[in-house]
Amino acid sequence: MSNVVNHRSGLMFALCLSTASLSAAPLDEALKPLPAVPVLDPAKVELGRQLFNEPRLSVNNTLSCASCHQLTSGGADNKPFSIGFDGKPVQINTPSVFNASLNFKQFWNGRVDTLQAQVEQVVISPVEMGSDWKTVVRNLSALPAYQNAFEQAYPDGVTASNVQNALATYERTLLTPNSRFDQYVLGNTDILTRQEKYGYQRFKDYGCIACHQGVNIGGNMFQKFGVMGDYFKARGNPLESDLGRYLLTQDEEDRHVFKVPSLRNVAVTAPYFHDASAKTLEEAVDVMFKYQLGRNPSQEDKDLIIQFLKTLTGEWAGKPL
C-alpha cells in the first residue's frame, strides 16, 4: 500500500511541477519584455558614464547629456522644452534616454540610425550644446583623468569617434527592466490586477497596439500625427518641428510624420508628444483616441488603459523609476 501511495504522491508532485512550469511560461504577445542589460566593456561603460555627465561637451561648459536626460526623472527632464547652452528653450520635447538603444531610429524625425550619430549631432547642434568636435577633443585631452580613461578603453586615446562610441556604449546599458508588465509577459500572470489586464485588452482592442508594439512598445516605425483628424490645425501656432520627416525628405507624404515613441515608463515622462502639448497621461490618451484612432471610448475604458500604461514603468539601478 505504501508503495502505491508513494507512487501516486510522486505522480502528483510531478504533475504539480509540470503545471507550475506551464503557468510560468512566457506569454506569446505582440509586446515583448526587455532584454537583459548587455554586458559591455566596463572601461568604455564607465568612461561613457563620465562623459554623459560632462558639461565640457558643450561650448560654454554649462550643459551635459544628463542636464536634459536626467536618470532620476524618467530619462528626460519633465520640461516642455529643454534649455540649450545659451539659456533658450529648444523647439522639441526631449525624449527619454532610457531604452533608446532599442529604437530603430533616433530623434523624433528619425534623422539618424545610431546612438553614435545622435551624440555627434547633439554636441554640434546650434541650439543644444553648440560646440564642435575639435574643441571637445582638445578640452578632454587636456585633462589627465580623461587621458588615462581613454587610453584604458581605446588604443588611440581621445578622438571624436571614441567619445561618441563611449557615450553610445553607456547608453546601451540604460535599460529599465522588471516592469510589472514585463513580469506578466514572462509568465507571472498574477502580478497585474484585473483592471490592468482589462486595460491591456482595451489597448489591443482599440488598435493602440498597431503602432505601439515590440520590445520597446513603440520606437520601431514612423507614423503620421493626425491620421484621423488635423491635429495641427486644431492646436494652432505652427512650429517648424511639426513638419517631422518632411524636414529631411521634402516629401509631402512625410509631412507631420514622426517616429512612434516608446511607451515604456510613459507614466513618468510627462509632458507628451514632440510639442509637449499634453501635460498629463490622460490628455495624451484623449489626443491619441481623437486624432490617431478616430474613436470615442468610454471614460471607463480610458481609465483602464491608463492603469495598464502605468504597469510599463521599469527599474533603474534596482529601484522603480
Model-derived regions: residue spans:
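Periplasmic c-type cytochrome electron-transfer domains
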Residues: 2-5, 22-321
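Bacterial N-terminal signal peptides
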Residues: 10-21
